Amino acid sequence: MNVLMVEPGKVPYETEIGSDLASLQAAVGGDIQAVYPYEEPVALICNEEGKLTGLPLNRALRDEDGEIYDIVAGNFFLVGLGADSFTDLAPEHAAKFAEQFKHPEEFARLAGKIIAIKQPLPEEKAPQKSHGGPEL
């Protein structure tokens, strides 16, 4: 089935994964947890123990006011919801959530509050100059 994969430090991408439990678990690296934070018929599938096992923090989940209420650790993906099972993510939902999760995030505590700092996209990074000697 077609899903939108979101990995820590990377831009989201669409990919195909199997709909069986083993394939879902392989995609997140462990037992799965499905959460339903959106009005759209979409599930966010993540590693159930990602934070406990120390997987890298990935993206923040925000409420309607833009406030962070949770942070997903490790890989996660977005999948469509059928009548009684997961299904392909609709193209319009893939586009919407690819934009929402476009920028990788780093996290910091500031004045007792956790903030998410959007990181530049890989192609936006400034080239590194060599400081090994004079340029010719």
Where do the model's predicted regions map?
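N-terminal nucleophile
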Residues: 1-11, 15-121, 127
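Non-Sec secretion/translocation targeting segments of pathogen effectors
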Residues: 123-136
